[in-house]
Amino acid sequence: MSHHVPNLYGTPIRDPHEHKRNSASMGEVNQSVSSRNCERGSEKGTKQRKKASRACDQCRRKRIKCRFDKHTGVCQGCLEVGEKCQFIRVPLKRGPAKKRASVASNEKFSSDNDPLQYRPRTHSYPMNSGNNYLPSLARNSSFPSISSLFVPSITAQSQQFVKVPYDDIKRRSSLATLGSDSSISTEFGGNYRLDENLNVRQEGKDIVAKGMITPVEEMGACSSNVRRQGSQSLPIQEQRASPYINPFISGRSRLSSLSYTSEATTSEGNTQGKNQCMLTPNSVRSIEKERLNSLTAGCPNKKLGTDGRSDKWDKNSTWKPVYRSSNPSHPSTEKNVSLNQEASAKPLMLGTYRQFDATSFYKVLGIYYNFFHINFPVIPINKSKFTDMLDPEKPNVIDEIRQINNEIIQCFKTALEVLVFCKIKQRRSSKSTKSWSRDSLCDFQKGLYYIQNFNKCIADCFQSLITIKPVLKQNSSVIPSRIKFIYFSTIIVLNFILILAGEESSLLLGPSVGVFNEFQAHKLFLPFENTSPMLLLNSNEESGDEILDYAVLFKRLYILLNILDTLQSFRLGQPKLINLNFGSAIETYFSDKTGHNQVVEKAPVALDNILRNLKLGEFITYFVLNRKSLQVNVPHHLLFTNQTDYGEFAVEKGEHDNIAGKFETLLKKKEILIRKLLNIEQKNDHILENCCNSDAEMKNIGELVCSMITLVSGILDSITNMNAENSVDLDSKPLPNAYFAQDSEEELMSPTQSITSNLASEENTRCTTKDLMGTVSIFMLPMVEECYNIISLIGPIPTTLISLYIRNGNMAKGINDRIMTLSTALNELVQITALFNTLEPFRKNAHDRAKRYYVSATSSTGCYESVMKSMYSGKCAASNASNVAPSEEENKKILKKFADIGWKLMDDSELGCCCCFFN
């Protein structure tokens, strides 16, 4: 009888005299894990599978051939539709799986190698039970735990799913090889470092106590060697930099994702989780090349503190962005890494050997300047100058400052990627050649990740900016102004993304205004800007051989933030956070008068459209600041006597040809119509006596309503022709190959900048609808919502006026012309209804409109009562109403209806176009 003496690690030591007697038994429980894996790998090395055991569920449902690609990890059919291969279909066939006719031999092999059937010997010394359940390798490395590398045969039906899509049991590397080194080198450069910031024993006890992992007692002795090797390599890990810290998963979430792998093997029926955690059949190099990101993405069922879409992504995750946080609460021993080193240290993308380096980022930057910048310059400088700002070697700075610079630039890249990838129009048809799935699988997977983790990406990126803020403020005098410009541009980009998506909260806008105010950005507009030190400004810095005035650039950023604040106030009816009067800031700071070096856009056509849109934002700011509902101490009689002066924003000749000019004119006419309709209520009897004879006021109302309907029709038609989905359409404006080259400044400029000299003439500097095809506008959603509210309220007026004219029977000269004009307006209303159904922002928000009704303001009949009317109830009675004879009951109802329309239009202006109320 042999005797086994347990060592200090709990692993029995074999008797040397029994080596010959036990050499023939592969499954002997006294053998070590590493030797057993090596023997099993050598024995089964010749049985390599060449393809998936069966077709995926998507191909089986479509009855097409499943062409599986080992490099991409998905079949061709799933790749074209942007899905992941699933193998969750329950088989109906009975009997063993293919190539498993000999059940007895396989059962013997599985019994020898199944760790769950291994019985550890009793320890001869006292031991804490919590240490037995601690999978140290799984807790401190980004590879799955030991239990996840072996898939036990729980039921007869689940046994044949072990081989989908690869036979990972027969083709895997030795665990001792994986655990011997704390860093797995790859052929693409960089090391994948294990996490050294965790206290292995204490964290393991806490997680087991909280129930985050399922203890597997049988794994205690089996993982002792690996646990010992992992603990010995911890001092080496602390000396290495970690380029693979994931910013989109917090420390606790990343911890739970790694600890879940030991739990996956004990849950029944979770075949998808098993397939996701299994190693690929190739060597360690193949593992790093094909499955690195899927292993570090976490388990399918982990719980995150964000929205539920994160769980959906983790099931099919093959890519996650890399971001290096600078949280001061977690000290790091990392060395300073240059920007080029950070770019090369990004995680490898599935199915591609090209890393996401500076070349592909210039492509993202080119998409922004082609599809976003032409409508709203979130980055208020031309592309060539901004590209120079991103150069990390200009100017030369010390290592500590370079690290801050690189972190800020990385934040900006993440924010710009979220903006671009979330607005790419995905093509389901295989005929399109500009879809991300056809262009680059890496880009396609980025888009999926950013869409499914949209809120989390925005929150984490902004939190990183807030973390950097104290360091930036403390070292403001030595940090270059170009880095501070990129920092505040990132804040503008994040707010732009949320407002573009129709976010109805200001959780990010308020802190953003606070950051600008903390750096005293508002003092740049005040007369005493030269008498006090500016945190934002250093001395003017050279960009190439030219000097940039960063004071003008920071003023542009603050004005853009003011316009974003205006759009939120316009939609939601809330007070503005920035109430500074900038005057004619657009013409002063954004036109080409500021100088050729810092012009917003070099192309005259694009610059003209930018100025028009910014002037629209300037007008809406003036429109919002003059809301009567926000003027608490204004006397009631000012409702009709104090009229807003819009003479400063007079419509120029030809300005109504574009969308911005039409919408500005629509808002002006809306205010005029409100005054006319409310004046009818004051002198209703007098108007009704002469409404069909000499009432010029009723005629003006009809003409005003018809002109507003025509404007709405023109606005919606232009939006539909330009970009109905308000997303990036690469088919309408393809990107040139110049974005992959950086040899000259012309190649870094957008296609709109390659213009001929004849465009400098006045008539050719107007931006047409053709120039805006496929571009994205932040004004589109407020325009569609406001047009919908206006049409819903003034739509019944033409029908009411036509019936009034016909019922009175007075068909004098001029009445027929009025009826024809009103009939034309009715035809346009039909076209407007069809246009609304084709607009993507309206369709996405239509189902939420029923929730925006103000229930407390409804009458007993169920009709909405105006909020503004209740505010001014009894305060706007007409002084001459008692001197007018009573009119007919039916005409009174018509006038009352017109007055209610005026009040509701006023509600739309005062309470926000997003919170609309209808009958």
Curated annotation (Swiss-Prot):
GO MF: DNA binding; DNA-binding transcription factor activity, RNA polymerase II-specific; zinc ion binding
Keyword hit for DNA repair: no
Xref: SMART domains: GAL4 (SM00066)
Name of the protein: Transcriptional regulatory protein EDS1
Gene3D superfamilies: Zn(2)-C6 fungal-type DNA-binding domain
Subunit comment: Binds DNA in a sequence-specific manner.
Comp. bias (Basic and acidic residues): 37-46, 304-317
Major location (coarse): nucleus
Biased composition regions of type Polar residues, renumbered to the chain: 23-36, 318-338
UniProt xrefs under InterPro entries: Carb_Metab_Trans_Reg, Zn2-C6_fun-type_DNA-bd_sf, Zn2Cys6_DnaBD
DNA-binding region: 56-85
One matching Pfam family: Zn_clus
Region (Disordered): 1-54, 297-338
Keyword annotations: DNA-binding, Metal-binding, Nucleus, Transcription, Transcription regulation, Zinc
One GO term describing the cellular component: nucleus
Taxonomy, superkingdom: Eukaryota
